[in-house]
């Protein structure tokens, strides 16, 4: 059964690549050639997230059975082909639906002296209406500036290609979801500009249907491709410094994977809106209730596009309550883990 599935998967990938090469939506060959100056000599490690867990993992699957690791691999292969055509050396951490340990993925990037690390993922949540891009960098925005810059480019290109240039996105530290140490593949490759990209949510029925379509996979790959070109064409690449900031922030414990599929996780936005409304009304009792609701929203969906505002409103409440130490900690959390778009005066990259 598994061997048969792998054979079908290989055949599909061959068809997928063939389809996209002749697709009118694929970037023109002249475009790849014109980008050779930006990518010539660059080593780019592409990490298709997960893999080989269909028999053991019931979390990473859409409403009609499409699995995240299959989507990740399709997009990664397409992106790799685009980058090769433009002159880059491309390293994929996996090329089939197989399990690769997280430490090995980081090791592959380091051993090949990668100039950029791109981990391709897709997201899941209990709310089927949710669908927007999330991009993670490792550690602190003030220390890992190169990855924040690249992450901003990726997020905006994903909005451009998959959401017609409209709608929200999140650019956050991996400490927002793994509050003690961040994500393994980004932690293990720290020093290389790198991100984890969660382009869309396969738990959205409409999105899952799109993610099965080769041309749509190609659009996503094109978004990453354009972001990579923009990054290497930047006149000045920001620095990555030694990690100190994350250890200076008390961990904010949040819902993990399966917990984010629970019914209470669906209340993330309504809890945010209720908390915001109570804060405006004022009064000590309302402030306490607002703080609890905002905290619950941030815990249940820590990387949502309202999570930063949840923390900013929590900060406002803490200031009103005169809790000096808690205020200082919340200020650090916001500054380190939820950077403002274009905070270092980079131009808007959607268009």
Predicted regions mapped to residue ranges:
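Catalytic-site microenvironment of enzymes
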Residues: 2-351
